[in-house]
Amino acid sequence: MLKNLLIVLSVSYLFVACTGKDAKKQESAFIVMKTKSIKFADMGFIYSSSTGVKVEVYAAGQPLLDLDINSQNICLSLLKCMDKEQFNEEVLSASYPSTLLENIFKSEAIFEEKNLEKVEGGFKQNISKEGVYDISYSVISGKRIFRDKINKILIKIRKQ
């Protein structure tokens, strides 16, 4: 009887211990972000999962920026949360799609894969709309570079 109870508890523990967690991919990276309102270039960590992205940036070992991107909004250093469209308007450009920043941190194509060109080790995209944005974006061998010449935005992520 005790043996059967022990077996049931052991099997139950295995099922409970192996469920309910969202798998996360973690990477350390050198992150550069220059926009009209945010400027930094430091080491950090990027945590990706199916539910969103979390970015932590450190300067001299101290937390500098905490960016949490989920399906509805973007939270900046636990102080200010805003929906993705509002974040784009205030920090990036109102003309960008709401998924842009998340796609960059996840190494995914932007603007629904518009002008996607596969290259060795990744892909490139050149997207422009006269007077609104002039974007070059590449994800090649663990290095992501997003540059918008019109809005003067640069996001570089170099995997460490």
Predicted regions and their residues:
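Post-signal peptide N-terminal segment of mature Sec-exported envelope proteins
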Residues: 26-49
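Mature, soluble, non-transmembrane domains
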Residues: 88-160
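An acidic-aromatic
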Residues: 51-99
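Bacterial signal peptide processing site
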Residues: 19-21
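Glycine-centered tight beta-turn/hairpin loop motif at sheet-sheet or coil-to-beta transitions
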Residues: 37-39, 60-62, 79-80, 128-132, ...
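Sec-dependent signal peptide recognition
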Residues: 2-9
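C-terminal motif of bacterial Sec signal peptides marking the signal peptidase cleavage site
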Residues: 14-17
